[in-house]
């Protein structure tokens, strides 16, 4: 309905780096991260690609896949996570703002179907 009634616009979906690769089991002391999480996040990335081809040229559809965001995790988890990230830390909550502003603006008028990973290099290993 959104696409039928609009001549231009931008949709930004959210996934996760776990939609791009498997979690590291040793990071989770209470057991492995459930497979359903990664499967659902991979589905969001595929949905983004599908919608980007079906809603173009008027509606752009992109996805942002953040890595770990620092927010009330215990210090041991933050340390384990940070050891696996080239930037040696978790993301701060405001570090997606510039990217989101870009993807929602006309400055990204030719960007569609992309999954942008913002993970401090996590998926570069």
Residue ranges of predicted features:
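Conserved N-box asparagine in the HATPase_c
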Residues: 1, 106
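Catalytic loop of short-chain dehydrogenase/reductase
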Residues: 3-4, 12-56, 68-69
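Glycine/proline-rich active-site loop of Rossmann-fold NAD(P)-dependent oxidoreductases
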Residues: 7, 108-111
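Conserved SDR Rossmann-fold cofactor-binding beta-strand/turn motif
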Residues: 15, 60-70, 100, 104, ...
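Short C-terminal tail/terminal secondary-structure segment
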Residues: 29-30, 101, 112-125
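Short, small/polar-rich loop/turn modules that mediate ligand/substrate recognition or access, typified
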Residues: 56-60, 111-113
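A short C-terminal helix-loop "cap" of Rossmann-like NAD(P)-dependent dehydrogenase/epimerase domains
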Residues: 72-86, 90
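A conserved structural motif in NAD(P)-dependent oxidoreductases
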Residues: 85-96, 107
């Amino acid at each position: 309905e959104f696409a039928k009634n609009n001549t231009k616009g931008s949709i930004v979906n959210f996934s996760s780096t776990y939609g791009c690769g498997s979690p590291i089991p040793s990071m989770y002391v209470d057991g492995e991260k459930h497979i359903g999480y990664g499967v659902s996040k991979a589905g969001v990335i595929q949905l983004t690609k599908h919608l980007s081809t079906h809603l173009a040229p008027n509606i752009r559809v992109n996805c942002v896949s953040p890595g770990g965001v620092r927010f009330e995790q215990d210090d041991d988890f933050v340390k384990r996570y940070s050891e696996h990230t080239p930037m040696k830390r978790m993301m701060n909550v405001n570090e997606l703002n510039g990217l989101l502003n870009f993807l929602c603006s006309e400055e990204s008028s030719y960007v569609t179907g992309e999954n942008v990973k913002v993970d401090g290099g996590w998926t570069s290993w």
